[in-house]
Amino acid sequence: MRRLFDADVAVAEVDPREVDPEHVLLPVERDAVARAIDTRRLQYAAGRHCARSAMRTLAVPPGPVTQDDDRAPRFPPGLVGTITHTQWWCAAAVALESTRAALGVDVE
């Protein structure tokens, strides 16, 4: 996915099966998927893991990625981003809001 974006966009990818939601999710994120099935919880955790990894690449403090009422990811203030996944792959792209108005990728 890296090749889809310019250098000012940080990208991270992971196999959701390699992520432990209990160790990755922040409390506010954990609450959002407390009643979700395991597959959804894994994909949600993998997306947040990738998003925070991308934030670190941008040298910004990694924060929670909550969700809007339509389940779209809501990034911390000053950041824009996107999260996408399949059953076996998850990725996030994050940029500073000062350089991008929005980002979007959907693989399915």
What spans do the regions from the language model cover?
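Core catalytic alpha/beta fold that binds nucleotide/phospho-ligands
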Residues: 1-108
